[in-house]
Amino acid sequence: MAQANFGVVGMAVMGKNLALNVESRGYTVAIYNRTTSKTEEVYKEHQDKNLVFTKTLEEFVGSLEKPRRIMLMVQAGAATDATIKSLLPLLDIGDILIDGGNTHFPDTMRRNAELADSGINFIGTGVSGGEKGALLGPSMMPGGQKEAYDLVAPIFEQIAAKAPQDGKPCVAYMGANGAGHYVKMVHNGIEYGDMQLIAESYDLLKRILGLSNAEIQAIFEEWNEGELDSYLIEITKEVLKRKDDEGEGYIVDKILDKAGNKGTGKWTSESALDLGVPLPLITESVFARYISTYKDERVKASKVLSGPALDFSGDKKEVIEKIRKALYFSKIMSYAQGFAQLRKASEEFDWDLPYGTIAQIWRAGCIIRAEFLQNITDAFDKDSELENLLLDDYFVDITKRYQEAVRDVVSLAVQAGTPIPTFTSAISYYDSYRSENLPANLIQAQRDYFGAHTYERTDKAGIFHYDWYTED
């Protein structure tokens, strides 16, 4: 007998917490896990909640009111396909499957098309905020059939994080098929960029200025009170003050400098390459993680490859402020690249992505939540056809005032032999984007020389080829 309003498949921490989040809003939630003992564990732990414990998929599906609203919180990839395959014979036309996993958007597009043939609605939903966000309120990026989203929107709007600025829920319809998971993918790419920029700032403060963890922590705390106010700056200041619970000193100094990844940053860069969109800062942040994993080689190289030694004797306070400005400037470059990629993808896949709304739903609940996202929303509210954020008046003003600081910081780091790939990439992207003329004319001449790839001229229309092998 149907008794549940919503169902969640997958009782790992994200699935469990999302189920509890939905239940806390007054809904009865059916729960299922392939391993029954896991479902039973969650049920017994929360017997005071309106959870329906089910042992089989048949029992799970049968417990749900129609149209059934089922959220899949299982491992992305083959596990998701297997779960859908098992569910499909049990569902009725009009039922709604929601994939809340970290799914690659082409998989979501494929599943949406396949399930549409069976009359089953499919909503690929990017969920950001980690396990805490899942429980208390994540940022959610759903994409799929609009009429299906309308049936789950009341629940999503209740469980999503609420922006502190205006209390609006951090969820909105992104567009058809894979739009939601694409937006989440770019969110993750921007997250890579933000984290690497913060890491480089930390390295500059520590390596060049010789500041202690306590001093750097205080700097990040101050930065978080201004235009850099964000979740990642907030947790950075927390990380820097934590002591090692297994010995002396700070825990950050005991953590091996090898950064892991789950591949979502790579997906963002791969898609940018496929679309022909310049995404240098985010891509450099992916490569920075990769080179960090070459620890043994880096140790060997450090003993044989020479570099400059800089004994800094300047005004530390002045440099700290320049690093702050460089960080904000570079953050803007990262978001400008990310939103330019969203625009290109929206055109390519016919999604009509709501750019200003995307920035709005990232204001709370998600990893990249930041105060300056409102400036992005304002920019698209003023001009929905804005080609690049750098052309908006607010960002024009910031880049005009802060670019000198970035150039100084990059110069200082190069002189000190301190790697700052994303800071360097930021100013290079800015200079490339603002250049009326680039040396690509020479590249096109070379291509025409060795491969007869032709070229266009600046003085007249048409496609041309030069006879390079004829002597002057």
Curated annotation (Swiss-Prot):
GO MF annotations, alphabetized: NADP binding; phosphogluconate dehydrogenase (decarboxylating) activity
Listed pathway(s): Carbohydrate degradation; pentose phosphate pathway; D-ribulose 5-phosphate from D-glucose 6-phosphate (oxidative stage): step 3/3
One Pfam match: NAD_binding_2
Active site: K184 (proton acceptor), E191 (proton donor)
BP GO annotations: D-gluconate metabolic process; organic acid catabolic process; pentose-phosphate shunt
Substrates-to-products reaction catalysed: 6-phospho-D-gluconate + NADP(+) = D-ribulose 5-phosphate + CO2 + NADPH
EC code: 1.1.1.44
Protein keywords: Gluconate utilization, NADP, Oxidoreductase, Pentose shunt
Function: Catalyzes the oxidative decarboxylation of 6-phosphogluconate to ribulose 5-phosphate and CO(2), with concomitant reduction of NADP to NADPH.
NCBIfam families recorded: gnd (TIGR00873), PRK09287.1 (NF006765)
Family affiliation: Belongs to the 6-phosphogluconate dehydrogenase family.
Name by which UniProt lists this protein: 6-phosphogluconate dehydrogenase, decarboxylating
Gene field: gnd
